[in-house]
């Protein structure tokens, strides 16, 4: 077995996916074509890499664990389509890593460690123009938040930000027994297809993000109270006016607002001088 004797490191959030049926299903969800370019994050011992490598034109796998890099390079030494990159995905410039491939968009396959999933998600979000499809395995709780609808307990910042720019699909649940060592929680595989343009116009996206973060900053508080203290450049009176223009009751909670309502509110607040 490849990498036999190398134990998962808790500090790296490692849980190696060992279920061949789940691995095959993930490879199918990636939906590869012979000319596709694949970025794999966290290949581990290379089980998924092996299934992907013979179905695409090129595969770049980024692995942080210094013990696994030589194992992976040895395993794929005879496959010129595979490149193993030693590094931290959070510190690598994705544009530098992938841009030399002639501008073609990449597909992503990743089993994200639970402890870094959110910052990696935002790295993908902010570089979304590089990708045509992402297939990510995440802690189920994070997956639920990404795909949540307004008014549900899981709906929040991740839901709004990602649904603005991606079609997000829950693909499958992966039980703990599919991993070694066995984690304490379920995982979920989700696919993300970047939209050609945002689902709705938000005006200045940085302002929109600050607004959304403010709206979810105190879930027990009303929307008006959350936004009043969010540093968005409006007085309480102006905030009330913006909410009225959008037909949004100031006593609502942030988690009840749809993406369209957040976008309309962002535009209205900026029109009144929000900054």
From Swiss-Prot:
Keyword Cytoplasm: yes
Intrachain S-S bonds: none
Pfam families for this protein: RrnaAD
SMART domains, A to Z: rADc
Catalysed reactions listed for this entry: adenosine(1518)/adenosine(1519) in 16S rRNA + 4 S-adenosyl-L-methionine = N(6)-dimethyladenosine(1518)/N(6)-dimethyladenosine(1519) in 16S rRNA + 4 S-adenosyl-L-homocysteine + 4 H(+)
GO cellular component: cytosol
Compartments where found: Cytoplasm
InterPro entries named in the record: KsgA/Erm, rRNA_Ade_diMease-like_C, rRNA_Ade_Mease_Trfase_CS, rRNA_Ade_methylase_Trfase_N, rRNA_adenine_dimethylase, SAM-dependent_MTases_sf
SUPFAM superfamilies: S-adenosyl-L-methionine-dependent methyltransferases
Ribosomal protein recorded as keyword: no
EC number: 2.1.1.182
Gene3D superfamilies: Ribosomal RNA adenine dimethylase-like, domain 2 (1.10.8.100), Vaccinia Virus protein VP39 (3.40.50.150)
Keywords: Cytoplasm, Methyltransferase, RNA-binding, rRNA processing, S-adenosyl-L-methionine, Transferase
GO MF term set: 16S rRNA (adenine(1518)-N(6)/adenine(1519)-N(6))-dimethyltransferase activity; RNA binding
Residues noted as binding S-adenosyl-L-methionine in the record, renumbered to the chain: 15, 17, 42, 63, 88, 111
Biological function: Specifically dimethylates two adjacent adenosines (A1518 and A1519) in the loop of a conserved hairpin near the 3'-end of 16S rRNA in the 30S particle. May play a critical role in biogenesis of 30S subunits.
HAMAP family (UniProt xref): 16SrRNA_methyltr_A (MF_00607)
Family classification: Belongs to the class I-like SAM-binding methyltransferase superfamily. rRNA adenine N(6)-methyltransferase family. RsmA subfamily.
Name the UniProt record assigns to this protein: Ribosomal RNA small subunit methyltransferase A
Gene, per the UniProt record: rsmA
